[in-house]
Amino acid sequence: MQAIVAVDQNWAIGKDGDQLCYLPPDLKRFQRRTTGHPVLLGRKTLATFPGGRPLKNRRNLILSRNPAFAPEGGEVFSALDDALATAPADTFVIGGESLYRQTLDRCDTVYVTKLHRSFPGADRFFPNLDQAPAW
């Protein structure tokens, strides 16, 4: 499995339920890397997408504790282990914070876009790989 993320200089990834910013070159990179591959994400991350809809041309494996949550074009799982049991090796973990933390030890590659600035008030963070000896 692999992860893909955009972080600021403090490894922040979000603020107030949204991404820190939307950079067209990074969005294109994300699209190039993930198109044709399964993506694993949480329900709150899905809510940040245009229209709150699953990504096109990808198998969307979505974690949600809400049994009534059933977005068209997505497969919903209430337990991470159930989602991982169906996730092939080429799956991309795409957020959010909790899912990254729970799956990082299962990833063999992390694609990081590092923004050389900080976002005051950021409230969601990716594990700091600069301080992780294994990375």
Which positions does each model-derived feature cover?
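Enzymes that bind and transform nitrogen-containing heteroaromatic metabolites
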Residues: 1-135
